[in-house]
Curated annotation (Swiss-Prot):
Assigned keywords, A-Z: Endonuclease, Hydrolase, Nuclease, RNA-binding, tRNA processing
Pfam family, one: Ribonuclease_P
GO molecular function: 3'-tRNA processing endoribonuclease activity; ribonuclease P activity; tRNA binding
Keyword set includes tRNA processing: yes
HAMAP family, sorted: RNase_P
Gene name, Swiss-Prot/TrEMBL: rnpA
Protein's recorded name: Ribonuclease P protein component
GO biological process, one term: tRNA 5'-leader removal
InterPro entries assigned to the protein according to its UniProt record, in alphabetical order: Ribosomal_Su5_D2-typ_SF, Ribsml_uS5_D2-typ_fold_subgr, RNase_P, RNase_P_CS
Summary of the function given for this chain in its UniProt record: RNaseP catalyzes the removal of the 5'-leader sequence from pre-tRNA to produce the mature 5'-terminus. It can also cleave other RNA substrates such as 4.5S RNA. The protein component plays an auxiliary but essential role in vivo by binding to the 5'-leader sequence and broadening the substrate specificity of the ribozyme.
Length: 121
């Protein structure tokens, strides 16, 4: 298994983010919102992260949240379908609530909307 998080697993360009948002396939929970595309034409998933200054004013807090999400993706990317994902942090989380954020991310990425894992937006 490859646990690296190389450049090919990231959404880097504005067009990549825009194409994911254009699909309007979003699910959200308390802390996170995940948008996904129907497919990216590649053999692996890619992820983009959005953490605004409105969510957390300090850069170190925003970086911590992105680090937690990247690490979760790095460990679980082999189980994900080859789609593009954009994860937006809706509410600030820290070390005390990072476990909840990881659980929400797993529900949003793997959960089935029919079972109520994450509400369709």
């Amino acid at each position: 298994m490859d646990y690296r998080f190389g450049r090919q697993y990231r959404l880097l360009k504005t067009d990549d983010f825009s194409s994911v948002f254009a699909f309007r396939n979003r699910r959200s929970r308390d802390l996170l919102q995940v948008s996904r595309s129907n497919g990216n034409g590649l053999d692996h998933p890619r992820i983009g992260l959005v953490v605004g200054k409105k969510t957390a004013k300090r850069a170190n807090e925003r970086n911590y949240m992105k680090r937690v999400i990247r690490d979760w993706f790095r460990l679980n990317k082999n189980r994900l379908p080859p789609q593009d994902f954009v994860v937006r942090v809706r509410r600030k989380f820290d070390r005390a609530t990072a476990k909840q954020a990881r659980a929400e991310l797993a529900q949003l990425m793997f959960g089935n909307p029919a079972t109520g894992c994450g509400k369709q937006v």
